[in-house]
């Protein structure tokens, strides 16, 4: 049979063969242990979709461009990737979704790096394809169980911080570059003192001439302890441990642990998955929370027909390890994007996510008991967005207002107060059964009557129109 082409009796036929003879298997039944991938394929003109899909399966598993005699020394049937289904994308000419199944044995256990090297390592430069995008991955429990996952997860984080029943509040310290360590620490203290739970190093604050990392760590730790003492709440500052080498990164993490701070931070795409997984292991062993920033993600995920969708990068992060990850804000975006963002927010938080193509989820994903990751909404949000954010993200999230805190006309601490008051008002209104989508502006206005800080913030940013009226259509 053409399927079992590895028997010696067949003889060795040299030459270039169509990929689809070996790698396109529409009658294949996927196994529970297979890693499944959904690729959006745009073939070059004249290349049939089956051949393109099979080429993806081949190039990302056992195939090479010609038949080689060493194929006879292994069982291709056991190790090859298989393109088992192809469907056209509605409304797009010459776009197809190719589903590929990879046998589990092709991957090293506990290595996101190896998983990506195999699945997306070579195939994106393939000539027969005009463009290729990895839309989704199904990680089988047999594989996800080989990963530690997030250092702590959502529940343990709440227990460590003693904060329940509401989203957490953060703020990125700006200007991101140029402050001295002492002034930086002062800004941190003011925000935490005003009522935020966290402040954050910007992703590109590492260790520059104007502020070396040790100085920053020391001044921020001082700010944290001072704010904790004055407010009676646990506070944190995401100290960015990202560095040029893994050794230096771990050195910074060790110093943070010695200072006794609760949380550090890493840029997982620029730092790389290997570094990130090492850091996540260190964080779990030493009781540090790990905040993940996705700097560079748009380079990879912005094109709709080429690259890797962010939901795949988010799944990979949950396996590699991180307690928070930035995931977009949803507010003021289009409906469709909103559903898709909520799709990967669920992939980060929940144990079991059912297949739902309307939210961009191509496969049912069962994480078994891997801890969840808190999604972080950050970027261009302010107090008027608070009802929408509370409604959309729910309690298990971190809402980060950078300019929305530091841009307050009276300063950082009042800006923090305004955000905290707005958040508490929204949470209370929700718990009393009010509809945040419809009454959001009203709730904020009521709260601003007894909080001058909030009133000032409302005045600066004015009301915004919520672009969603009907939340129930989801």
From Swiss-Prot:
Gene3D superfamilies to which the protein is assigned, alphabetical: Ribulose bisphosphate carboxylase, large subunit, C-terminal domain, RuBisCO large subunit, N-terminal domain
The entry's keywords: Calvin cycle, Carbon dioxide fixation, Chloroplast, Disulfide bond, Lyase, Magnesium, Metal-binding, Methylation, Monooxygenase, Oxidoreductase, Photorespiration, Photosynthesis, Plastid
Taxonomy, superkingdom: Eukaryota
Binding locations of Mg(2+): 200, 202-203
UniProt modification remark: The disulfide bond which can form in the large chain dimeric partners within the hexadecamer appears to be associated with oxidative stress and protein turnover.
Site positions for Transition state stabilizer: 333
InterPro entries listed in its UniProt record: RuBisCO (IPR033966), RuBisCo_large_chain_AS (IPR020878), RuBisCO_lsu_C (IPR000685), RuBisCO_lsu_C_sf (IPR036376), RuBisCO_lsu_fd_N (IPR017443), RuBisCO_lsu_N_sf (IPR036422), RuBisCO_lsuI (IPR020888)
Protein name: Ribulose bisphosphate carboxylase large chain
UniProt source species: Dendrophthora clavata (Columbian mistletoe)
Gene: rbcL
């Amino acid at each position: 049979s053409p399927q079992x082409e590895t028997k010696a009796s067949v003889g060795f036929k040299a030459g270039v063969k169509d990929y689809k003879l070996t790698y396109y298997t529409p009658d294949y039944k996927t196994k529970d242990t297979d890693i499944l991938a959904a690729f959006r394929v745009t073939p070059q003109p004249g290349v049939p979709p089956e051949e393109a899909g099979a080429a993806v399966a081949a190039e990302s598993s056992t195939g090479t461009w010609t038949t080689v005699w060493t194929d006879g020394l292994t069982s291709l049937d056991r190790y090859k990737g298989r393109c088992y289904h192809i469907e056209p994308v509605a409304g797009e000419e010459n776009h197809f979704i190719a589903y590929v199944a990879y046998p589990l044995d092709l991957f090293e256990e506990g290595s996101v790096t190896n998983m990506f090297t195999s699945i997306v390592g070579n195939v994106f430069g393939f000539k027969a394809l005009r463009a290729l995008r990895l839309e989704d991955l199904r990680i089988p429990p047999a594989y996800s169980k080989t990963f530690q996952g997030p250092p702590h997860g959502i529940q343990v984080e709440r227990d460590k911080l003693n904060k329940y029943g509401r989203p957490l509040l953060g703020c990125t310290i700006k200007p991101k570059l140029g402050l001295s360590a002492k002034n930086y620490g002062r800004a941190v203290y003011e925000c935490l003192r005003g009522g935020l739970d966290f402040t954050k190093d910007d992703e590109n604050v590492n260790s520059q001439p104007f502020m070396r990392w040790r100085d920053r760590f020391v001044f921020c730790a001082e700010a944290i302890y001072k704010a904790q003492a004055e407010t009676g709440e646990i506070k944190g500052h995401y100290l960015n441990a990202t560095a040029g080498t893994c050794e230096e990164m771990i050195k910074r993490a060790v110093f943070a642990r010695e200072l006794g701070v609760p949380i550090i931070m890493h840029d997982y795409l620029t730092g790389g998955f290997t570094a990130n997984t090492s850091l996540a292991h260190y964080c779990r062993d030493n009781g540090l929370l790990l905040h993940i920033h996705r700097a560079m993600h748009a380079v990879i995920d912005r094109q709709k027909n080429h690259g890797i969708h962010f939901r795949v990068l988010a799944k990979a992060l949950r396996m590699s390890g991180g307690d928070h990850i930035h995931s977009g804000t949803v507010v003021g975006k289009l409906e469709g994007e909103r559903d898709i963002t909520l799709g990967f927010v669920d992939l980060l938080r929940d144990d079991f996510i059912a297949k739902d193509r309307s939210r961009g989820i191509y496969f049912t994903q069962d994480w078994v008991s891997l801890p969840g990751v808190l999604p972080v909404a950050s970027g261009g949000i302010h107090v008027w967005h608070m009802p929408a954010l509370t409604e959309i993200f729910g309690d298990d999230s971190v809402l980060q207002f950078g300019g929305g805190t530091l841009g307050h006309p009276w300063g950082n601490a009042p800006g923090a107060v305004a955000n905290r008051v707005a958040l508490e008002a929204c949470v209370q209104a929700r718990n009393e059964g009010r509809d945040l989508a419809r009454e959001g502006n009203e709730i904020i206005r009521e709260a601003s009557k007894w909080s001058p800080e909030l009133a000032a913030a409302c005045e600066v940013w004015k009301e915004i129109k919520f672009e969603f009226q009907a939340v129930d259509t989801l």
